[in-house]
Amino acid sequence: MSKILSNQEVKGTKDWLPGEFFVRNYIFSKWREVCLSYGFSEYLTPILENADIYRAKSGEDIGIKELMVFTDQAGRDLAIRPEMTPSVSRMVSKIYQSSPKPLKLFSIANFVRNEKPQRGRNREFWQLNCDVFGENNFLSDLEILQLSLDLMLAFNPPKKSFVLKINSRKLIDDLFALLNLPENKKIALTRLMDKYAKLSKGDFVKSMKEIGLSENNVKRIDDFLNAESIDDLVDKITELKNRGSIEEIKKIMKNLSDLGYQEYLLFSPSLIRGFDYYDGLIFEIFDNHKDNNRAMFGGGRYNGLAELFGSVSFPAIGFAPGDETFKIFLESWNILPQVNIYQDNYYLPLLSEKLADENFILAKKLRSENKKVEQGLNLLKIGKALEYANKKGLGKIVILGEEEFDKKIYKIKDMQSGQEKVFDLN
């Protein structure tokens, strides 16, 4: 006897049943609608890439620990993409010089990471990536932040259900310049700061000292990460007061406030973003729900990634929300539509073997009228047909029995109201 195989999906992946697929498509359609309203164009890259493009810039976790790698028959290390930013940068590097600028692109694609599955994190997940290439100015930063806010507001969330946290890698670089850190310690400190919320104060201080920070610099890092506002930050670390990075953050927050987004904005110096390729503005959308108090998605500016591909350097900024965190947000705030996915469908049962051909003809006619028609393929009595339609939640049933055919008519019954309407078969 052959081995019986499990019918369960791989841990950290999921089968998309019709009801779940409807929810996913609802989220994706909103994403697509908002991106198109900003004049962005849709694209897609292969799910397989050379592993080195992620090892180089995706950070220690995603680029090494969580990368799903295999060797192909030619001996090349290939990876299933764990994120889109290096992939789209590779793609754009091929077309950048011949393309009108800026390039405003978005994609909705699936990704795989070899990480421990948990709430809001799966091994396989879907993600929107939205990026602007070819503009390195304040206005492109402003537009991508506005788009991320409008993406949230498209789902009509309650007031104060989320916040946009803003910081800048330039500001962090300005801080590091004050610390006189050697270059090789900056990456280690950046990654440590990214884990600040997950570590105890004692462990965090200990790790900073292991990197080589003095007592004075440990205090400066602590003051930086715990600043409650821009004014609070420059009061604590006065050397940052007139830096361009501070002025950029002030300006972008003022402009977003002037556009009507003031209630959603928060300067957050403890926001670091763990990807090594960020080099300017960074941001995160944060869910404020008490049961789901976490980052939903984030993004930022990454101007140096094209150099990996020997291409002319080009500026870029983008962000990437995932399907699962978005779904949890909608569920937590009770704003996910509760819809019967079959309520708009018509059910045309086979009520007589003699009418099989006529059923196909009628189904074709109804579909030509843009109706969604599920055609019965087995002979049923009307009672069983009604029972099936009711159990599945089909909105309407089309009745064509021998009696109706003799009269050259068919009936459509609304399953909710019970109302019937008669139509000419010809």
List PLM regions with ranges.
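TRNA-binding/sensing appendages of the translation machinery
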Residues: 1-86, 94, 142-146, 163-165
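N-terminal targeting/leader regions
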Residues: 2-17, 184-235
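A general alpha-helix detector
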Residues: 12, 87, 147, 171-175, ...
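Positively charged, Gly/Ser-enriched RNA/tRNA-binding surfaces
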Residues: 23-40, 49-50, 85-96, 105-158, ...
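Beta-rich nucleic-acid/ligand-interaction surfaces
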Residues: 45-64, 163-178, 272-279, 380-388, ...
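Acidic, His- and aromatic-enriched active-site or binding-groove loops in soluble protein domains
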Residues: 63-74, 181-203, 287-289
